[in-house]
Amino acid sequence: MSRYRGPRFKKIRRLGALPGLTSKRPTPGSDLRNQSRSGKRSQYRIRLEEKQKLRFHYGLTERQLLKYVRIAGKAKGSTGQVLLQLLEMRLDNILFRLGMASTIPGARQLVNHRHILVNGRIVDIPSYRCKPRDIITTRDEQKSRALIQNYLDSSPHEELPKHLTLHSSQYKGLVNQIIDSKWVGLKINELLVVEYYSRQT
């Protein structure tokens, strides 16, 4: 299944706010989650919607998300918590959380077009897994810096999560540590996502 490129407002009406996909939010009364035909959502539907929230927020294909779930399942600790950490530490998401891109698809485009460096080297893989002490900068070119400056100027200037530091005048971000679950940028019940996949096998 490919990455979603359809109407974004349609998705947030169905699933609620998806800040990684769009800065728009569902208007009061437009949220369809509580308007299912039966009047009551099944447990399967609830798990499916949580999975879809995760997929659309981070801009993943079904295959990519399944791969992350499997990696998280083999790691020590809570599968759901590890899954969120893996997704939050992706380079495209780190750029988004730093305010260097307005959405995760926008961040992915910056990476694909080779505007971004990690520790002084160009990285053009959006799924690159960032680590503590990584330094994220832009190429020293006018076009690259102009793109980032435009995003920084239009950023809502929300409080940065504790695992990141931004030096906006230098177009530089620092990864201080692995993200703590309370700083995840999406309201999600990750256990329902894990349950969804465990019941598919």
UniProtKB/Swiss-Prot annotation:
Residues 89-149 form the S4 RNA-binding domain. GO terms for molecular function: rRNA binding; structural constituent of ribosome. CDD domains: S4. Residues 15-43 are annotated as: Disordered. One of its GO terms (biological process) is ribosomal small subunit biogenesis. Disulfide bonds: none annotated. The keyword rRNA-binding applies. Its main location: plastid. It is found in: Plastid, Chloroplast. Keywords: Chloroplast, Plastid, Ribonucleoprotein, Ribosomal protein, RNA-binding, rRNA-binding. One of its GO terms (cellular component) is chloroplast. One of the primary rRNA binding proteins, it binds directly to 16S rRNA where it nucleates assembly of the body of the 30S subunit. With S5 and S12 plays an important role in translational accuracy. Part of the 30S ribosomal subunit. Contacts protein S5. The interaction surface between S4 and S5 is involved in control of translational fidelity. Belongs to the universal ribosomal protein uS4 family. This is Small ribosomal subunit protein uS4c. It comes from Nandina domestica (Heavenly bamboo).
